[in-house]
Curated annotation (Swiss-Prot):
Function as written in the Swiss-Prot or TrEMBL entry: Probable cell surface metalloreductase. May be involved in iron or copper homeostasis.
Leading EC class: oxidoreductase
One GO cellular component term noted in the UniProt record for this chain: perinuclear endoplasmic reticulum
Organism expressing this protein natively: Eremothecium gossypii (strain ATCC 10895 / CBS 109.51 / FGSC 9923 / NRRL Y-1056) (Yeast)
Official protein name in the record: Probable metalloreductase AIM14
Length: 516
């Protein structure tokens, strides 16, 4: 009687990538611990290091952090298997790497993130964006490599391989990743950020739960479980930290051509205590509307202080989203911008903002002016048109630069590119004087006794651009000091100039990029 021959269902290398998956997960956890330690060592403010790489490490720059992360992942990528004889092992390993990294990528976007509480959401966003591109690229190459392998193998049919149920699911994920990479390019994002965001949301959810069905051996434990928990925390936060509110008042100056408006919301949309310069996100949809989950909410900076009667927003209106009095809006999140620790450790502060950057500069200027006794405080606001000044009630102490003359003819070379800042450059893109006076007029048309007249600015400059070395000469010390802080907010070109100035003079800086 002939003996039966047992044939293995899978080859000897079927489980070759299990260990690498755990290694990738461990590296991801290690990276989170590294982020935690980098900020914990900064118990006090220090001058920005003249060693660029060290400063990039502290700041969490993806230009340095991503290569370091990938280097550690590459160390164990090539094992004892021959790349030529066991190419499928490394193709599968690339796919597993792509999926396991989803845990880290989703973790970086948690709001609030209680573990990385020393980072703001915006500080972690660049790493999330570049890690997303790396994950998508790994997944695309994983699928492409198998298509090429099957096409070159005369012993298998490409069609039969692709339309095998498990491989078909992988093929669907491959198409989704290609679409995500295409829509994440700068051209597409600038044309339709909403389209990019919707593709991002749908793909993230689909890939998280299709890959576990496709992958062999499975990835459900622990990866899919942890990813599902993080996605659940995202959903819970969007439900728990959401409240409905209507606009109390809208101050505009359309008659004079300004698109800058000031919005007043009820005070209860923010907690009793919050750090000046904090941010909120606003959605025009209710939580029960699917678009609430698929369409991006709009980020804005709180232009008021905790002691004020209302929560103020200063923004530039555009066709995509406009506040109106009457409709109710969903206030989705509030989160810190500059940290309270940074504000408490400085004695000399200069604030330079452009356009809607006033929404960050104004509350910080008021905070230092009204609640602290620092040795030096200066604020500069650059606007394109004199009509934009209507959003402020009090100009006292603010130096203003109007880059267009009174005939609204642009000054040659006066920052024409400032209108071209794309939304995704920084997620916090903060999108008639007669109306302001009406609140203070009696029935006869006379000003009521309680009316406060606008105070004069520190200086106003028409048709002249900011000269950093001149305007900030009194701020600069011969040697950098940890108690100096330059806050710069506005168009990318303004922020870039401010960062360069701070770097040249070894000054601690805080930056945010808004549209002009």
């Amino acid at each position: 009687m002939d003996g039966q021959v047992t044939v293995k269902r899978h080859g000897d290398t079927h489980f070759a990538n299990i260990g690498y998956g755990y290694y990738t997960f461990g590296v991801s956890v290690g990276y989170i611990l590294l982020l935690l330690l980098l900020r914990k060592r900064r118990g006090t403010a220090v001058p920005r290091s003249r060693h660029k790489l060290f400063q990039m490490m502290i700041d969490g720059s993806p230009a340095l952090h991503l290569p370091i992360l990938l280097l550690f992942l590459e160390i164990a990528f090539l094992g004892h298997y021959s790349v030529i004889d066991h190419a499928s092992v490394y193709i599968k390993r690339l796919g597993r790497l792509s999926y396991v990294l989803l845990f880290l990528n989703i973790f970086l976007t948690l709001r609030p993130n209680y573990i990385l509480s020393d980072y703001t959401y915006v500080q972690l966003l660049p790493m999330h964006m570049w890690l997303s591109r790396a994950i998508s690229t790994f997944g695309v190459f994983h699928g492409l490599a198998f298509v090429i392998k099957w096409q070159l193998d005369n012993e298998v049919s490409l069609a039969s391989k692709l339309f095998n149920l498990w491989n078909l699911l992988g093929f669907i994920v491959w198409i989704l990743l290609i679409i995500l990479l295409i829509t994440s390019t700068g051209v597409i994002r600038r044309r339709s950020y909403k389209s990019f965001y919707m593709v991002h949301q749908i793909n993230a959810f689909a890939i998280s739960f299709i890959v576990p069905v496709h992958a062999r051996p499975g990835v459900a434990l622990p990866y899919t479980i942890t990813i599902a928990v993080l996605l659940g925390l995202h959903a819970l936060a969007r439900v728990s930290f959401c409240m409905s509110s209507a606009v109390v008042h809208k101050l505009s100056n359309y008659q004079k051509g300004s698109k800058l408006v000031r919005i007043k919301l009820p005070r209860n949309v923010m907690p009793e205590h919050f750090t000046p310069g904090s941010h909120i996100r606003v959605s025009p949809y209710r939580r029960s509307n699917p678009l609430y989950w698929l369409v991006p909410s709009h980020p804005f900076t709180i232009a008021s202080l905790p002691d004020d009667d209302h929560v103020d927003l200063i923004l530039r209106e555009h066709g995509h989203f406009e506040f109106e009095v009457g409709p109710r809006y969903s206030i989705v999140h509030n989160y810190e911008g500059i940290t309270a620790l940074q504000l408490g450790l400085v004695n000399r502060v200069t604030i330079v903002v452009g356009g809607t950057g006033i929404s960050l500069g104004l509350p910080l200027f008021r905070y230092f002016k009204e609640n602290t006794d620092i040795g030096y405080l200066k604020m500069i606001w650059t606007v394109k048109s004199h009509a934009d000044l209507h959003v402020l009630d009090d100009f006292e102490g603010i130096d203003i630069f109007v880059t267009q003359n009174t005939t609204t003819t642009p000054i040659p070379g006066a920052s024409e590119s400032w209108d071209e800042i794309p939304l995704e450059e920084f997620e916090l893109n903060s999108m008639d004087d007669l109306e302001a006076e009406e609140e203070h007029l009696g029935e006869s048309g006379a000003l009521l006794p309680t009316t406060k007249r606008k105070k004069d600015p520190g200086a106003i400059n028409i048709g002249r651009r900011l000269d950093w070395n001149v305007e900030l000469a009194s701020f600069v010390r011969s040697e950098g000091s940890s108690d100096q802080l330059l806050i710069v907010c506005g168009p990318e070109s303004l922020v870039k100039d401010g960062v360069q100035f701070a770097t040249d003079h070894n000054i601690v800086f805080y930056k945010e990029v808004y549209s002009f």
